[in-house]
Amino acid sequence: MTSETSTLPHAMRGEANPAAMAALAIMAIAAATLAGAWFFQLVLEILPCPMCLEQRYAYYFAVPFAALLAFVAAKGAPRSLVLAGLAILALAALGNAVFGAYHAGVEWGLWKGPTDCTGTGFNPGSAGSLLDNLDKVKIIRCDEVQFRFLGISLAGYNALISLLMAAIAAWGMAKTSRR
């Protein structure tokens, strides 16, 4: 390899770029997960609880952030910047995995969930307002499973998918730090 080609970004030298590959994989997984969540909600009419909606935030963050990271990694951004971006994705995914596991534990009754979505903090107000609101509000409880596949709820799958995304980010970090 000549000194001229060694200064080019890895992609321009025909080499694989693990950071860009990891970021693109995370972006694709996050986008597919969001598409699945919206499919369940809009087509199958499996409505999300408040905790389910909050778990989507990590995916909403990951799609554009991972796309931007893949772009700058492919363009030869400084290694420290790319590693920091992958670390941010890994931490966001790990945090979401913990949140998903917590939610799955609430569904299994292992611990109590937030009172605003588990039905334990119900305040009926007056009898008249209660009757007026009964037909208007559909409360989706966080401690009731809306859908299971192979015995795992959507919150459980969120934890597993988030762990996969964190592992991909860690792989990208390990490969990038060795370059």
Task: Identify the function of each model-found stretch.
Residues 1-18:
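Short, Lys/Arg-rich, polar N-terminal cytosolic tail immediately upstream
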Residues 17-27, 75-97, 167:
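Interfacial segments of alpha-helical transmembrane regions
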Residues 26-33, 40, 65, 69, ...:
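Hydrophobic residues within membrane-embedded alpha-helical segments of Major Facilitator Superfamily
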Residues 32-41, 94-110:
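C-terminal TM-helix exit segments that contain a strictly Trp-centered aromatic cap at the helix terminus
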Residues 46-61:
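Loop-to-helix transition at the N-terminal end of transmembrane alpha-helices
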Residues 68-76, 170-177:
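Structural signal for the C-terminal ends of transmembrane alpha-helices
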Residues 108-153:
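Extracytosolic (periplasmic/ER-lumenal) interhelical loops and adjacent juxtamembrane/interface segments
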Residues 136-179:
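A hydrophobic membrane-anchoring alpha-helix module
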